[in-house]
Amino acid sequence: GRQWRWQRLADGSQVAAISFAAEGAQALRLGVLAQELPAGAVLRFYGAAGDKVVEMPAAELAALRLTNEAAGLSGDAARMVWGPDTAGAQSTLEVQLPAGATPEQLRLAVPQLSHLTQTVAQASDGIGKNTAQIGDSGSCNVDIMCGSYQTEGRSVAKMVFTKGGSTYLCTGTLLNDTRNSQTPYFLSAAHC
């Protein structure tokens, strides 16, 4: 945290930012290793000017670390968080420390970057556009455009994940259980 250029804001908080560039990238994702982050701190991710800003509060990062540990990860693997995809060849990570926190309390690194050759929106546009095989589906395939399947059709979602520095886009289905527990079950292909 000491090597950043910190600016003190009127409310006593401090903010600093660092940008990463990858020539030819359509989008980037930053792999952030948050080893120590003061309570109340906020990470912000954004691309080019006018791009939406995505915030990740320290509490959210702590919850993600616990989820990762519950899934069997430990150490740096549990602390690694992938930021959102930001359009363009540049991505900025901004850190805001709350009033009373010091940069010495921050241990943060960006050891990985995923260089996307197309944005997630561009990749999503290509899903399901192959019309050459219309009519070749098996008899067990159901046309969800039929009136009786409209509710089920709204349960399809996309998932973006990064593994080993490569970013993937998959689709899946949101599932409910018979207890209506509101547990967010997501069923996808094994390779996802």
Language model region names:
Residues 1-166, 170-192:
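Domain-level representation of secreted and single-pass membrane ectodomains enriched
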